[in-house]
Amino acid sequence: MKIGLLGKKIGMTQIFDPGGKALPVTILKLGPCLITDIKKMESHGYAAIQIGYVKVNGNKLNKAQIGHLNKYNMPLVKFLKEYKVASTENYQIGKWITVEDLSINQNISVSGTSIGKGFTGCIKRHNFSRGPMSHGSKNHRQPGSIGAGTTPGKVFAGKKMAGRMGGKKVTIQNLKIIDIKINNNLIIVKGSVPGKPGNIVSIYQ
């Protein structure tokens, strides 16, 4: 059964494997997530489940969100997300998905919002090389030429220039689950995960 879960990034640390090698790991607190809706191939044209995470008061949601959750008498949840599945036969509305549905040594993909860096130059943002720092040069950290002259007479779209960096959705694939703490809804994955501690993350197989 394909699993998708929402949760929060707790932070990074390191653990040691049986051979004494230090492994960089990230701790994630996932779920429990409630199946709030099921999209079937016959009625919607695709098969998916919708899950909800973090119970909230009604004043935190708009009327459309409250009406959607009240359709099946669901608890009010703040975050909703859909995950496509091959078949919806193994899922029921109102069922809870927890870390118990995951297994150690399983590979998962983790999506989150990367740390925003603000407005940055082309050296930090695109790894440009800087110009000379002496001998009369005034072109230290400038981008250089951004195109030809009269022909084409414009800067082409997508040109690498200074701008906002980070703060975008990033997905890291094939992170290995090292350990699962069922009582605390925690999993430990090898490697790093996008975003700051406390950020909402989405995991799926």
Curated annotation (Swiss-Prot):
Disulfide bonds: none annotated. Keywords: Chloroplast, Plastid, Ribonucleoprotein, Ribosomal protein, RNA-binding, rRNA-binding. GO terms for molecular function: rRNA binding; structural constituent of ribosome. It is found in: Plastid, Chloroplast. Gene3D superfamilies: 3.30.160.810, Translation factors (2.40.30.10). One of its GO terms (biological process) is translation. Its main location: plastid. GO terms for cellular component: chloroplast; cytosolic large ribosomal subunit. Residues 130-150 are annotated as: Disordered. InterPro entries: Ribosomal_uL3, Ribosomal_uL3_bac/org-type, Transl_B-barrel_sf. Belongs to the universal ribosomal protein uL3 family. HAMAP family: Ribosomal_uL3_B. NCBIfam families: L3_bact. One of the primary rRNA binding proteins, it binds directly near the 3'-end of the 23S rRNA, where it nucleates assembly of the 50S subunit. Part of the 50S ribosomal subunit. This is Large ribosomal subunit protein uL3c. It comes from Gracilaria tenuistipitata var. liui (Red alga).
